Amino acid sequence: MTISPMKILMVHANREERGKLAIMLARFEHPVTFSDGIDSLEFNPDNYDLIIVDEHLTGGAGILLLHKFSKKIRKKTIYLSSGDEKVRAFYQNSLEIYECMRKPVKPMNLAVVACDFFVSSHFNNGELATLNS
């Protein structure tokens, strides 16, 4: 089974941190586009297969950006939060996002969650009919 490269948007104000996280995703040949804040977003989230949003952005909190997204977009979003387990569970359940990961995020852990998202989205679309694909 192979999964084609998926387009990822990473919204993260810290250039060094987003670079570390993106390197691991790029190793799996997923093209990653960057934005640093909610005010400078010049993208259409519908054009991406996965969106990763940090809690601290230029121009405001990442949670404000999540509230701007439609439910459809939030379902394909990973949110990076320093909140405790209860806070992260609240974000994930109330906003119906795919995953809320605890910061600091290890690049490999982010890659695993992204891979899980891609595989589950293929299953949900009925694209993996057999294991021989």
What kind of feature is each model-predicted range?
Residues N14-T33:
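Two-component/phosphorelay signaling modules centered on CheY-like receiver
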Residues I51, C100-M101:
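Two-component signal transduction core modules
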Residues A13, L80-E85, P104:
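Conserved active-site segment of CheY-like receiver
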